[in-house]
């Protein structure tokens, strides 16, 4: 049935909207929707030609048949428009997640495995600046480049370049910092997954799952972004 494939794509987008990582691009499903839309367009062209012929020969035309033809043409156009809207919504959601991740200055995952939790995109340690967001659970904190199609990889690369150029005009301002000042300098955190050793100004601690620490928030902000820690 027309529209079922687009519905599957939207359901996939809905499931991934609250994930902290960008899932695999649905290449086969997108291609199938495009093919379906192309077939619908051919049907619309045929129905449009039929309607034109009937209107030119209105004296001998069957009025009931004309109404059926108009209804078929209308429904066909609706299906095409819905497919287009679903495709655009899916692409926009993924583009928004790429944009969101780009501002966090975190290394994307280029292959299976974890990145170093103590390093951000520019190789600095975990005591970096305040983050764009304070609760990583609702934001994109992981980006596996293998899950992006070629166009998305190019988009990510160009968007990163755009951000870098923009930030260079405001060297004294942390544009990726949180707009709201922290309520407390120190905070309690819980480790969500195992990691390496973290060096801070006040000492060293190891990322061992389910362990808890009382640390300066600015020292672990990047780890919270990456999903290694959560505030409690």
From Swiss-Prot:
GO terms for biological process: DNA strand elongation involved in mitotic DNA replication; double-strand break repair via break-induced replication; mitotic DNA replication initiation. The lineage of its organism: Eukaryota, Fungi, Dikarya, Ascomycota, Saccharomycotina. It holds the Pfam family Sld5. GO terms for cellular component: CMG complex; GINS complex; nuclear replication fork. Keywords: DNA replication, Nucleus. Belongs to the GINS1/PSF1 family. It comes from the Eukaryota. The gene is PSF1. Coiled coil: none annotated. The GINS complex plays an essential role in the initiation of DNA replication. This is DNA replication complex GINS protein PSF1. Component of the GINS complex which is a heterotetramer of SLD5, PSF1, PSF2 and PSF3. It is found in: Nucleus.
């Amino acid at each position: 049935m027309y529209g079922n494939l687009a519905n599957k794509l939207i359901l996939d987008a809905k499931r991934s909207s609250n994930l902290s990582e960008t899932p695999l691009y649905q290449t086969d499903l997108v291609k199938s929707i495009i093919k379906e839309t192309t077939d619908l367009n051919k049907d619309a062209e045929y129905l449009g030609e039929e309607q034109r012929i009937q209107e030119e020969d209105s004296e001998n035309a069957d009025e009931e048949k004309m109404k059926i033809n108009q209804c078929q043409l209308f429904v066909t156009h609706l299906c095409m428009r819905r497919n287009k809207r679903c495709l655009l919504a899916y692409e926009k959601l993924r583009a928004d997640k790429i944009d969101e991740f780009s501002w966090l200055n975190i290394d994307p995952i280029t292959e299976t495995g974890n990145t170093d939790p103590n390093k951000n995109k520019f190789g600095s340690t975990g005591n970096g600046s305040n983050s764009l967001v304070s609760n990583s659970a609702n934001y994109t904190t992981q980006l596996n480049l293998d899950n992006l199609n070629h166009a998305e990889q190019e988009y990510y690369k160009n968007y990163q370049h755009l951000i870098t150029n923009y930030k260079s005009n405001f060297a004294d301002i942390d544009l990726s910092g949180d707009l709201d000042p922290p309520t407390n300098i120190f905070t309690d955190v819980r480790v969500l997954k195992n990691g390496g050793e973290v060096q801070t100004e006040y000492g060293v601690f190891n990322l061992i799952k389910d362990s808890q620490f009382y640390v300066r928030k600015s020292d672990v902000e990047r780890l919270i972004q990456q999903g290694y820690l959560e505030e409690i």
